[in-house]
């Protein structure tokens, strides 16, 4: 299925998209011509998304069949052969991890906790919201195949009312099937009070706000039943587990990870626009802050100064497995890719391309869309396909 996207997006008044009626329509009517044109183009883009995704899925199926046939016949290039074998290895690890969960064999799980603070929906652009959703998918995939996975990952401030744009994005990711993950409409302040033995309630029912229920449609109401806050997961105990907000602006350095602590990662993509955001929030809530001991490594990266949410999480789980911060950081972002001799524009472009391909292949493979296959560099990662299981 081929889609002439450019022609469709630039279509004139005859295009099927219409300015909506009611409140949204009134808002658009007050816009300038340029703003209205931009809004109409965005509406047309939303219309063709299902078509693009269907076309991409078909292209992937064809590519997967070609790879399977070529692998069996021994006619693949070395690069394609390596990618196929890597994907098989990751798929094998995924199945083994799933087997352990289903059999109740979680003895190797790390019994501390990680919180993703999603209380920044209003500070991100739509593009950043999309990136945040993708990062949450990568994070889940990493944890599910980790040598020592985190038993409890809580996502706070997540609902149609608390984080409307992220909620909408995440509908395509089947988040409610993710193992070891807990989702709260309530914010970080509620979690803090629940872990405080002087204020926490031993038995509390999951509560979804009336505002959220009023906004919910039929499908959304079924998803709302998967929100578990403010019930603290059974492996975390009030009075025992302490919160630690990870912030690059913190004075204290995190020397090791403790199963008596819950580490908070700020769920925001802001390209470093908002200075001291997480540090300030933690101080306001009275939560201890600490920074990862990787400052010397960050200084060696000429093109990367801000770590993504999934990269921070990956460093944590790699440290849990390796017991060494330097080895953990090197495993997540290899320093060799940023050697002084490779600081040319071409080298940087190649590095970014390779990292993107590696991430997409690993992420897709971990979810087992097919037995053999790769996501090519030009392919758009479809969350509906990539994160469809568990």
Swiss-Prot record:
Keyword set includes Transferase: yes
Active site positions, chain numbering: 270 (proton acceptor)
EC number: 2.1.1.221
Binding residue positions for S-adenosyl-L-methionine: 246-247, 266, 270-274, 278, 292, 305-307
Keyword Transferase: yes
Residue ranges with Acidic residues bias: 357-390
Membrane-spanning ranges: none
Keywords per UniProt: Cytoplasm, Methyltransferase, Nucleus, S-adenosyl-L-methionine, Transferase, tRNA processing
Gene Ontology MF terms in the entry: tRNA (guanosine(9)-N1)-methyltransferase activity; tRNA binding
UniProt region (Disordered), positions on chain: 1-72, 343-390
Biased composition regions of type Basic and acidic residues, renumbered to the chain: 43-59, 347-356
Gene Ontology cellular-component terms listed: cytoplasm; nucleus
Every SAM-dependent MTase TRM10-type domain range: 92-340
Entry-linked InterPro entries: MT_TRM10-typ, MT_TRM10-typ_sf, tRNA_m1G_MeTrfase_euk, tRNA_MeTrfase_TRMD/TRM10
Subcellular location: Cytoplasm; Nucleus
Gene Ontology terms describing biological process: tRNA N1-guanine methylation
A matching Pfam family: tRNA_m1G_MT
Catalytic activity, reaction form: guanosine(9) in tRNA + S-adenosyl-L-methionine = N(1)-methylguanosine(9) in tRNA + S-adenosyl-L-homocysteine + H(+)
Chief localization: cytoplasm
Function: S-adenosyl-L-methionine-dependent guanine N(1)-methyltransferase that catalyzes the formation of N(1)-methylguanine at position 9 (m1G9) in cytoplasmic tRNA.
PANTHER family cross-referenced by the UniProt entry: TRNA (GUANINE-9-) METHYLTRANSFERASE (PTHR13563), TRNA METHYLTRANSFERASE 10 HOMOLOG A (PTHR13563:SF13)
Assigned protein family: Belongs to the class IV-like SAM-binding methyltransferase superfamily. TRM10 family.
Subunit-level organization: Monomer.
Annotated protein name in UniProt: tRNA (guanine(9)-N1)-methyltransferase
UniProt organism field: Cryptococcus neoformans var. neoformans serotype D (strain JEC21 / ATCC MYA-565)
Lineage: Eukaryota, Fungi, Dikarya, Basidiomycota, Agaricomycotina
């Amino acid at each position: 299925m081929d889609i002439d996207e450019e022609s469709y997006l630039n279509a004139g008044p005859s295009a099927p998209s219409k300015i909506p009626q009611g409140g949204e329509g009134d808002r658009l009517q007050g816009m300038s011509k340029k703003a209205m044109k931009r809004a109409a183009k965005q509406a047309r883009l939303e219309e063709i998304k299902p078509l693009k995704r269907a076309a991409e899925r078909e292209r992937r199926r064809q590519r997967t069949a070609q790879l399977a046939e070529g692998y069996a016949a021994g006619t693949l290039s070395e690069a394609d052969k390596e990618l196929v074998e890597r994907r098989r290895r990751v798929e094998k690890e995924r199945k083994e991890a799933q087997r352990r969960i289903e059999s109740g064999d979680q003895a190797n799980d790390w019994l501390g906790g990680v919180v993703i603070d999603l209380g920044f929906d209003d500070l991100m652009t739509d593009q950043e919201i999309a990136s945040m959703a993708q990062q949450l998918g990568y994070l889940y995939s990493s944890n599910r195949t980790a040598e020592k996975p985190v038993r409890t990952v809580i996502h706070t401030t997540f609902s149609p009312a608390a984080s409307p744009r992220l909620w909408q994005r995440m509908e395509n990711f089947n988040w409610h099937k993710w193992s070891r993950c807990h989702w709260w409409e309530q914010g970080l302040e509620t979690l803090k009070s629940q872990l405080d033995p002087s204020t926490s309630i031993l038995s509390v029912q999951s509560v979804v706000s009336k505002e959220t229920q009023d906004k919910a449609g039929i499908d959304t109401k079924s998803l709302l039943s998967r929100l578990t806050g403010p019930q603290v997961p059974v492996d975390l105990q009030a009075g025992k587990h302490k919160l630690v907000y990870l912030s690059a602006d913190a004075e204290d350095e995190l020397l090791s990870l403790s199963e008596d602590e819950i580490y908070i990662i700020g769920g925001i993509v802001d390209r470093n626009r908002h200075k001291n955001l997480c540090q300030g929030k933690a101080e306001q809530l009275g939560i201890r802050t600490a920074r990862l001991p990787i400052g010397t490594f960050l200084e060696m990266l000429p093109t990367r100064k801000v770590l993504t949410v999934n990269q921070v999480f990956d460093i944590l789980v790699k440290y849990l497995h390796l017991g060494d911060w330097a080895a953990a950081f090197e495993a997540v972002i290899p320093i060799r890719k940023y050697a002084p001799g490779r600081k040319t524009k071409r080298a940087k472009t190649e590095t970014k391309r390779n990292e993107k391909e590696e991430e997409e292949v690993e992420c897709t493979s971990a979810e087992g869309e097919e037995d053999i296959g790769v996501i090519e560099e030009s392919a758009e990662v479809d969350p509906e396909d990539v994160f469809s299981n568990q």
